[in-house]
Swiss-Prot record:
GO terms for molecular function: 3-hydroxyanthranilate 3,4-dioxygenase activity; ferrous iron binding. It comes from Nematostella vectensis. This is 3-hydroxyanthranilate 3,4-dioxygenase. Fe cation binds at residues 42, 48, 86. Substrate binds at residues 48, 90, 100. It is found in: Cytoplasm. One of its GO terms (biological process) is L-tryptophan catabolic process.
Length: 272
């Protein structure tokens, strides 16, 4: 993974600032750099998982209807629930991992701008998102709008997404420290980091894991070595190697003593 980040480092600066590692299936695995400070807020019906690989970032949100800044430091992980207004602010010489899921056919995304009070919607547009390149034309549309010129909304919000105004967000946490604190619980097995919502994130220790993937499954080998067999094809994973197992695959993973790995899957209907 780190080698891939180095190879694509030219894309983590303006004007691009991001690169998709995996994106053909359910899981959208991308890396994002900066500087990229923005005024727009994104609203989607799925969760987003953040991990800061290099440097810190600020995620602006509306929590219980009030503006809030969440600082995600290098090495920290954070899960943003479904249907939360959020605006990622990224700084120079930083790289972050962001995982989203494929949108269901009936789902829409929203791009919103707020007035100076931070809570009144100035302008918004909703659309079915199949590609993140759709966002740039929407931003352009806002800057050409009367609302941008006057700073005053011209109509009431028409948001059809049931925006979350009740959840108190978790604090970002250092992944390495979590793994250290919970080592006895997954040393020879596995333990859930997240499992109640859409994203199912598990830490795995030494031993074997096998099954049939109903959906996509992304592996990230954090420490030590692992051998992964997918539909009779074998691959060796070393530290920071990653692998996507496609939906409908039979797999078997064997991790050596002292090995630590993460697996990530998604249930798109979990928060419906």
């Amino acid at each position: 993974m780190m080698e891939w980040i180095d190879e694509n480092s030219s894309l983590f600066v303006p004007p691009v600032c991001n690169k998709l590692m995996y994106g053909e299936g359910q899981l959208k695995i991308m890396f994002v750099g900066g500087p990229n400070t923005r005024k727009d807020y994104h609203l989607e019906e799925g969760e987003e998982l953040f991990f800061q690989v290099k440097g810190d970032m600020c995620l602006k949100v509306l929590e219980k209807g009030k503006p809030k800044d969440i600082i995600i430091k290098e090495g920290e992980m954070f899960l943003l629930p479904s249907r939360f207004n959020h605006s990622p602010q990224r700084f120079e010489n930083t790289v972050g991992l962001v995982i989203e899921r494929e949108r269901l056919p009936e789902e829409i995304d929203g791009l919103r701008y707020f007035c100076e009070d931070g809570v009144t919607v100035l302008w918004e547009k909703f659309f079915h998102c199949t590609d993140l390149t759709q966002i740039a034309p929407v931003i352009k549309e806002f800057f050409e709008s009367e609302e941008h010129k006057t700073g005053k909304p011209s109509k009431e919000s028409s948001c059809s997404i049931n925006v979350d105004t009740e959840t108190e967000l978790m604090e970002p946490f250092p992944l390495k420290q979590w793994l250290k604190d919970n080592k006895d619980s997954y040393r020879s097995g596995s333990m859930a980091i997240f499992e109640k919502g859409e994203f199912k994130v598990h830490a795995h220790g030494s031993g074997e894991q096998e099954g049939h993937s109903q959906g996509e499954m992304w592996f990230w080998q954090l420490e030590g070595k692992a051998t992964v067999n997918v539909d009779e094809i074998t691959r060796e994973l070393n530290k920071n190697d990653v692998l996507m197992i496609t939906a409908g695959s039979d797999f078997r993973v064997k991790r050596e003593e002292g090995s630590v790995g993460l697996s990530i899957t998604v249930d798109s209907l979990a928060n419906k």
